[in-house]
Amino acid sequence: MRLSYFHSPDRVPAEGMADAAVAIDVLRATTTMAWALHNGAEAIQAFADLAQLDAAASAWPDDQSLRAGERGGQKLEGFDLGNSPLAVTPERIGGRRIFMSTTNGTRALDRVRSAPMLLTAALVNRSAVAQRLLQHRPEQIWMVGSGWEGAYSLEDSLAAGALADALLEGSGASLLDLAGNDETCAAHALWQQWKDQPEALLRLASHGQRLQRLGDHDADLACCATVDSLTVVPSQDEPGVLRLS
């Protein structure tokens, strides 16, 4: 296995595709996706384009669907949910399909949706995702951070490093053998430095600060910083649709 990290969708190579791709948006899309599927959502259908989301959601019965979305960290007007992992409770989302669009995370998914294996990861499920990859051992794996509007993000790089660390431990490989680019090595070094205080890093990150300025997101930050609290692996079942597999 060779593991490469790209800190935003814009950094993904224009040509070719890896055997497996892992989309990461710790604050907060892929954390919310993991919790939603854990709590019984039928599926999550992700969209970068809001008009496409509206068209798809309108085709589903109201009692079987929910619209979830944010822009700039704030819930979209007229949507049922924003992008908080704490809002996707079993009572709210159980059995329903969530039609979702976020500022950054759904763009990352859209960029690699042609990958033969597409998973989503966050700190909350990094070991479960690592185990899935170790079961299949794809030759080339791309981790794609969501970043913030094309810029680097600390929190996504932390999760990429955490996933790399779990793959190193599970495979017995060296970083020299596993890392496909310098960004993977840098992400792993970031994880080594902050693995004992991930929430502190999320609060240091620019998007963590942005969320704190928008309101009381302490509980969201604590949830997103929890490592290996879930064993779910969201996986693309059909283009743009994530389920548990």
UniProtKB/Swiss-Prot annotation:
Pfam families hit by this protein: 2-ph_phosp
Stretches assigned to coiled coil: none
Cofactor field: Mg(2+)
GO molecular function terms noted in the UniProt entry: 2-phosphosulfolactate phosphatase activity; magnesium ion binding; sulfopyruvate decarboxylase activity
Listed NCBIfam families: PRK00886.1-2, PRK00886.1-5
Name of the molecule in the record: Probable 2-phosphosulfolactate phosphatase
UniProt organism field: Synechococcus sp. (strain RCC307)
Reactions this protein catalyses: (2R)-O-phospho-3-sulfolactate + H2O = (2R)-3-sulfolactate + phosphate
Enzyme Commission identifier(s): 3.1.3.71
